């Protein structure tokens, strides 16, 4: 047995390069960065001259290498000569000669970069140079040496046609060259008909809808009616009202507008009972005036689609890395439930093209949800109504994010900030529920905001029984905690018990409850299911580091996956990425960017064949090590330049102008530091 510091992954001595554990990247810090945030000056002394002290300088240098790269920007890489999209697909351009893109197909093909190809797994080996030279054309055209007629286009192979036409970097896979050198595009009509419903992404929002949203002309009558009710209720709450007791009559003026159910709840928490009328309103209509035409709380079970999630695996919604190609790969590996990346309600209502792209769904995603974040009913309820109207059959549930810890979201009153505002949260959930119709609403929360001040055990029974959420997921950490601290599964168990007790008291069917935090193996997963009362475990970081965890869970085993098998998963991701982001030059390099993002997590995986003890723990830090082959060592490299090299094994050489900036600064330094 090796002697390693506590909290260090127990790697067998023969694979160790150093006994010093490498720093775990701060996932919270990286998640909290945006392209508009600027780095603040660190370590300045108190003299006011802006000069750092020696001690502060040393601390700042250390922190600078451990923090997040703020303001990351990824420019779009385009062809030097840009062909008109309409002409590229054999159509007629509406702009004619005034089009700002070229219509000269022959000239474009002449200047176009050479075709790419995705090597087969059998072409790779586990020692350098690992794979074939992708700069070599397999079957060049007679008059077009830059076209490879032996390549296969992943888009054409899947759907029978390629929507990128002449712009496709794998054009030789769906083109023919005649004796005179003319190149024509071809399609597989039989395959197009066969896969029309199984390969095409769904949940597209058209330009007309985006325009309506931008101009604030999109009709949301359900949301408008609900918000008007809230306004009337708040106006009524601000009026002086007579409160009758057994001994006296007195005039009171409410200090702040709040929903009736929130007032009733606060009274109960203070040890007093709410007035009978308030109690009835609170339980049955959740703070909306009783005179309105409002469905009862039990509507969740009689009219909402029921969520049968027992025994199903759930891939957590993940910002940036939880894109459609990654979700598709996880589905192939065994994930049953998937959810899109978090979208902001304000951006949805502004008609943001980028935000609405987050709701796309691949047909292989069996149970799919859209996650929304916001800070008030006035944005979240209309967003829910738009989603319900645009995708009545394209979404299985909508998830309200009440767990996001990042500063940008929290300080705006969204995400985990809602955990400390039960009155507002109740209004949001009830309003979204009404706007969504039969589409279920789920809620993702944390144990609380501040460490030592958990409140999920109070909120969850209300979220389920009182506010009618159809499922709850609970991450076992507060907003204040960092990933270096373990999730509190004992508290998760306490929260589940509180919900089940409330449901039993009110004779309500149980809603699915999923816990989350630190699940990194099949053994972890089933231990949580068997001992903590949850219906399932939402898996986030565990899936980012080892997407095959879903296979392990389904097969109840720990998979000592080989480097070659991991390479196959990378190849799958590349094909899925090209289908989603595009097979033209821009799409190839967008796929490259997100592949590198995925590898920024997957390099952290320590092959279980190298460990002295199983199962591996997600928070154990790995010392520098070598794998069982050069390829396995490469896949474990913390150097972001090595991730780019891996991308080049499938996507060809990266353009000189293309640079990948990792989220974590420590990954931007040479791997020699990590090996020291």
Curated annotation (Swiss-Prot):
Catalytic site: 404
Cofactor(s) required for function per UniProt: FMN
Compositionally biased tracts (Polar residues): 253-272
InterPro entries in UniProt: Aldolase_TIM, DUS-like_FMN-bd, tRNA_hU_synthase_CS, Znf-CCCH_4, Znf_CCCH, Znf_CCCH_sf
Keywords annotated in UniProt: Cytoplasm, Flavoprotein, FMN, Metal-binding, mRNA processing, NAD, NADP, Nucleus, Oxidoreductase, Repeat, tRNA processing, Zinc, Zinc-finger
Keyword Transferase assigned: no
Protein name listed in UniProt: tRNA-dihydrouridine(47) synthase [NAD(P)(+)]
């Amino acid at each position: 047995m090796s002697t390693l510091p506590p909290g260090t992954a127990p790697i067998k001595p023969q694979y160790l390069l150093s006994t010093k554990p490498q720093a775990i990247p701060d996932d919270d810090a990286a998640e909290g960065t945006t392209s508009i945030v600027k780095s603040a000056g660190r370590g300045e002394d108190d003299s006011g001259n802006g000069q750092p002290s020696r001690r502060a300088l040393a601390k700042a240098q250390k922190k600078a290498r451990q923090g997040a790269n703020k303001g990351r920007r990824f420019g779009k890489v385009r062809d030097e000569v840009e062909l008109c999209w309409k002409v590229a697909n054999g159509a007629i351009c509406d702009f004619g000669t005034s089009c700002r893109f070229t219509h000269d197909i022959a000239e474009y093909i002449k200047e176009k970069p050479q075709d790419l190809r995705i090597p087969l797994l059998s072409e790779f080996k586990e020692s350098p140079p690992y794979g074939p030279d992708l700069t070599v054309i397999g079957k060049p055209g007679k008059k077009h040496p830059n076209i490879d007629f032996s390549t296969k286009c992943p888009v054409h192979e899947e759907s029978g046609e390629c929507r990128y036409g002449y712009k496709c970097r794998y054009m030789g896979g769906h083109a023919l060259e005649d004796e005179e050198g003319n190149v024509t595009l071809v399609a597989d009509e039989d395959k197009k008909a066969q896969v029309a419903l199984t390969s095409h992404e769904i949940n597209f929002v058209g330009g007309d809808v985006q325009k309506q949203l931008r101009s604030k002309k999109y009709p949301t009558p359900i949301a408008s009616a609900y918000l008007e009710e809230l306004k009337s209720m708040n106006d009524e709450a601000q009026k002086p009202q007579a409160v009758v007791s057994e001994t006296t009559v007195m005039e009171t003026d409410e200090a702040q507008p709040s929903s009736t159910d929130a007032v009733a709840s606060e009274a109960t928490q203070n040890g007093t009972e709410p007035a009978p009328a308030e109690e009835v309103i609170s339980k049955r209509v959740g703070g909306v005036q009783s005179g309105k035409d409002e469905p009862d709380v039990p509507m969740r079970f009689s009219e909402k689609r029921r969520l049968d999630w027992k025994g199903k695996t759930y891939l957590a919604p993940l910002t940036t890395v939880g894109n459609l190609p990654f979700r598709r790969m996880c589905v192939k590996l065994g994930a049953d439930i998937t959810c899109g990346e978090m979208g902001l309600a304000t951006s949805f209502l502004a008609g943001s093209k980028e935000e609405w792209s987050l709701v796309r769904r691949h047909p292989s995603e069996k149970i799919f949800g859209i996650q929304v974040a916001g800070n008030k009913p006035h944005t979240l309820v209309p967003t829910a109504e738009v989603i319900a109207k645009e995708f009545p059959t394209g979404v299985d549930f909508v998830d309200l994010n009440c767990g996001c810890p990042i500063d940008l979201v929290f300080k705006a009153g969204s995400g985990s900030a809602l955990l400390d505002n039960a009155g507002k949260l109740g209004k949001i959930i009830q309003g979204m529920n009404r706007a969504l119709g039969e589409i279920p609403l789920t809620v993702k929360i944390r144990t609380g905001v501040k460490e030592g001040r958990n409140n999920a055990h109070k909120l969850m029974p209300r979220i389920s029984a009182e506010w009618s959420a159809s499922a709850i997921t609970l991450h076992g950490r507060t907003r204040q905690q960092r990933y270096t601290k373990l999730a509190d599964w004992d508290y998760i168990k306490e929260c589940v018990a509180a919900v089940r007790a409330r449901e039993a008291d009110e004779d309500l069917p149980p809603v699915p409850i999923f816990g989350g935090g630190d699940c990194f193996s099949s053994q972890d997963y089933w231990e949580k299911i068997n001992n903590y009362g949850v219906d399932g475990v939402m898996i986030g970081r565990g899936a980012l580091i080892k997407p095959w965890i879903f296979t392990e869970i389904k097969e109840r085993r720990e998979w000592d996956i080989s480097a070659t098998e991991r390479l196959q998963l990378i190849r799958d991701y590349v094909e899925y990425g090209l289908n989603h982001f595009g097979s033209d030059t821009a799409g190839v390099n967008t796929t490259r960017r997100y592949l590198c993002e995925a590898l920024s997590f997957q390099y952290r995986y320590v092959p279980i064949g190298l460990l002295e003890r199983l199962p591996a723990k997600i928070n154990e830090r790995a010392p520098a090590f070598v794998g069982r082959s050069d390829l396995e060592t490469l896949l474990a490299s913390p150097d972001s330049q090595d991730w780019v090299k891996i991308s080049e094994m499938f996507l060809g050489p990266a353009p000189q102008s293309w640079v990948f900036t990792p989220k974590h600064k420590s990954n931007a330094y040479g791997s020699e530091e990590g090996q020291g």
